[in-house]
Amino acid sequence: MTITLHPGSVPLADLAKIYWHGEPAVLDRSFDAGIERAAARIAAIAAGNEPVYGVNTGFGKLASIKIDAADTATLQRNLILSHCCGVGAPLAENIVRLILSLKLISLGRGASGVRLDLVRLIEAMLEKGVIPLIPEKGSVGASGDLAPLAHMAAVMMGEAEAFYQGEKLPGRIALERAGLTPVILAAKEGLALINGTQASTALALAGLFRAHRAAQAALITGAMSTDAAMGSSAPFTADIHTLRGHKGQIDTAASLRALLEGSVIRQSHLDGDERVQDPYCIRCQPQVDGACLDLLRMTARTLEIEANAVTDNPLVLSDDSVVSGGNFHAEPVAFAADQIAIAVCEIGAIAQRRIALLVDPTLSYGLPAFLAKKPGLNSGLMIAEVTSAALMSENKQMAHPASVDSTPTSANQEDHVSMACHGARRLLQMTENLFAIIGIEALTAAQGVEFRAPLTTSPELQKAMETLRAVVPTLEEDRFMAPDLAAASALVADGSLVGSVSSGILPGLEGF
């Protein structure tokens, strides 16, 4: 179903649909008049003699060079072609769809000075499935995501390469097969297309959506691990968390209580348990995962604002003046990406400690070593835990902030940059690692719960276990394990594990 975008107020939920489901997007037609007004203003400047950056001047360090009106189209074409300097593998289709949609939103605010023809072409590319081949590397996140967005714009001109119906084609051929016509860029249009944070923001949004899904799944596996270890639910008591006051912590504790409600395992050790306190990885889940939830919610707000922002330069303001600024600088996105990386790292770190607890017979309160039915003859989940440790450590390495590593570019004209693009891109690998860690915890926790038979877990966790066991059977004896890990990770990544429990139990991104 096509999503109608209202620039300035597009909610994260719509952007998530574009990312997860590839839904096309169009601008609400009420924004057409504002787009046309700004385009007319730029056309008037281009026809005159007043120098305005990007309209009739060179770019970056070459901004002082005046360009003749007769060379306007050549200027914009040269800009795009010269900036197609991306390297590396192509970004995934759902990321590129998000980039195109974010560019629609920015242009739709009516401050960029592009013609409606450009807007309609982007809409048609989304509808028909013409997906520009955008290399993953080459942006420093200021002045905008120049190289990635140049590859997008080049396809609109009939240059570069694009995917259409699964085939990689020259840009012009891809457009032709979709029944579309390349555009000849008018004054400032090339600059408007590439001067923006849409690539960084799309990658950061992808990281956010994936991190939130993993965070929700981690509450399910964390609750399951709590039951498998016969851990206490007392630390999840509401009053404890209300006394501290952090919203994420309060919501996380509520989710854990709901997930464990009705567990016979939990009831069995309410009285007479000689253990006074559980290890932190069980007891402090609300404090750790709740803090991560708060971080994700903060970044969600930042990225929702950025998704609706005009990050072009110069801008056509409400009084028709055209003013140069710096909205292309992606520092807010870079900070958000760094915060998401920290949350992803910590969700995985505490989950890995729960995995380690369950496979250690000195900590697991009666479970066999490595959750093997015949330890010694079988190694059980020994190396699955080692894999989770490797993934956790890799994420720790990647969690180093990207935003603090500025370097001057473009002959020192662009002397401070955000590094938002690769800071956001690493979130794809980090969340892939996190999906696998949470998948491994699902395997260890479910195996541990089954060892507690005839005692049973809660109805909600039982539904999650049934979802897991539909694709990964109980480990009766050693077998080729890689498919088990892949299947469990896929349940986290595709949302099946989250979808297995009742709606409303797991916390959303709203509420901060």
UniProtKB/Swiss-Prot annotation:
UniProt entry keywords in alphabetical sequence: Cytoplasm, Histidine metabolism, Lyase
Catalytic activity: L-histidine = trans-urocanate + NH4(+)
Location in chain, cross-link 5-imidazolinone (Ala-Gly): A142-G144
Keyword rRNA-binding listed: no
Compartments (UniProt record): Cytoplasm
Coiled coil region boundaries: none
Modification comment: Contains an active site 4-methylidene-imidazol-5-one (MIO), which is formed autocatalytically by cyclization and dehydration of residues Ala-Ser-Gly.
GO terms, biological process: L-histidine catabolic process to glutamate and formamide; L-histidine catabolic process to glutamate and formate
GO cellular component terms, A-Z: cytoplasm
Protein name in UniProt: Histidine ammonia-lyase
